[in-house]
Amino acid sequence: MNSPLHSAHYRIPYFCLKLLAFIGAQAFLTYSASAIPNAVGGFLAQAESPLNDTEIGDRLLDPELWAGQLELPGTWREEAPIASVKGSYLAARPKVMGLPAIMVQARHREGKLDSLAITFADAGSYFGYLNEKLPPGLSPRQQQAELQRRLAAKQQQFSSFFRKTETSLRDTLRELTEKRPRDNHIGKTRTLRAEVIDYQKGNLALRLLVGNQRLIRLLIQPVDSISREWLDTDRSAMSTSALSRVYEGRVTKPDNGDVLIGTLSIVPQGYKPYCGLNTLTMAARYFGLHLDEDWLAVAGKFQNTGSAAGSQLPRLYLAVAREAALDLHKSNDFSLNEARKSIDQGLPVVVWRRFSGTRNKAHSRQTLMAAKNPDYRIPRPDTAARDSWPDHKSPLHASVVVGYNPSRTEVLFVESWAGMKIPRRMRAEEMAATAYLTFYFKP
């Protein structure tokens, strides 16, 4: 199922297309234009709340809310932080400015509301995984024709929904705000630059982001806090040496000999083909970038197909590094020594590697055994163990290496899905043997 990347030299991590095939098929068949983004694992699709289908736009713009005199409406659930900024999302499906909101997210800085983000359209959650389940008895040509027919119909539906949503939101913002809107942008790099339109209502900036027929999002924050950078203002104000100290301070060394970055939060990919994007998002948020997988999909030129085919992922890694005032080394293999140098400085390493469900179970088992017994070591791989490792025919998948154990020759890594609260473990030899492409972040 591997499909060529835009560059002839690299292929996209495609295990993402198979991991949750059943969930993906259900999503394709049942989720509507207001399908739920992957960050909450589909929870909102079933969330029961008195705010469902209820207009809350006025409450989100209330000056008393931003002055700290009122609480946000509804029940909020925690999500991955960005630097020192805490993140949460509303456990409801309300309306905002007369339109159904796919997701409402909040950011709090030192206990005070810092910004809101309302997503109105997102192709990644609308298309989900490509549904390949077809009626029996079709010839290969008929199968291809049926898939194309289904996809074309879904693309037409989304295009119409996207166009109507954008037009309605622009009209509402124009009527709602007092001043003439201004063109602006977010991002220092050309790859991640987002063109936005800034509207103003009182002391609030209403920043409209429309991304290439994939994403419609409204950002709300005080006028005096808007920025043209993805990097959090606390981080962008730091010197290079101060930033280095922040990252180095995240490295822990428990008694079992691990060297570990302890504060990299998981951003679950849900039913989207986004393992390469979500692992990068996890690193980006750790660096203090206000990025998510949905904008990265726009910047990476993902198509509205329910697949990662044709996207341009590798260039996003360098852009993320540049936005975070870091450097990047891309390699066709995995070097434990080079990974150690990055991790020692508090910088994670993203690895595209060959994936096997059998080996994934083995990694989980090894991880749990090590958690129960601090003296446990993964055995040195013999010929039989090496023969069980996935080869070049196996699907690709992206993981984030966040630690290592030098005396045990083990690496610790996290995935873009839930299920284990501690980093997984494997022998460094296996990571090196199965790695396809490695991204080392550097100071």
Task: Say what each PLM segment does.
Residues 1-13:
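N-terminal secretory signal peptides that target proteins for export/translocation
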Residues 16-27:
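Bacterial N-terminal signal peptides
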Residues 33-37, 42-44, 48-78, 82, ...:
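Active-site-adjacent structural segments surrounding the nucleophilic cysteine of cysteine proteases
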Residues 36-128, 146-235:
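A cross-family detector of function-defining hotspots
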Residues 111-113, 270, 346, 394-398, ...:
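Extracytoplasmic
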Residues 219-224, 228-230, 239-256, 374-443:
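Noncatalytic regulatory segments and standalone regulatory/sensor domains
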Residues 270-274, 282, 301-307, 334-336, ...:
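Solvent-exposed loop/turn segments at secondary-structure junctions
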Residues 308-404:
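Predominantly the structural core of cysteine protease catalytic domains
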